[in-house]
């Protein structure tokens, strides 16, 4: 069966004057009713899967949005604001940590992997249905994320990368096929992509994933 995932609520938040990811994190902590109103508009469409309003749960991202040391509070608030709407499925979105990554350096790989492990640990005692790794643009970063999550959790993982119409990743480094291979090898339950390609190109990308 096809499941509909909620759309990002950032546009609704912008209309409410909440522009940046820093403002979104702050609003979630101190003004959750604003986030709830954005979700209320989204639930009119009836999505079965609702996604956390923020995705900045790695230590590096928490620092970037001005929420250093507030990871647990942010995680609890993100799930609490969605619980009111009783979604069929709850997805915890985790965005790329943004740290430099040298795929030839073990220290760099471990540092990045542990970013995602620490993000996943925030949800170890929480109730949700799956992690949603979203917005990734390199297979190496995605690999670190999958390894980090698998280090601390056996929860299902949905993974998505940004892809160009020709099958190259949005960063210009690596391909969609390579990303799918990483997803399969490191335990993603669902492989997905986001693209600005034409419908025919998107269909070709989906076919390529099935063939990989």
Regions found by a protein language model. Name each.
Residues 1-212:
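Domain-level signal for soluble alpha/beta catalytic cores
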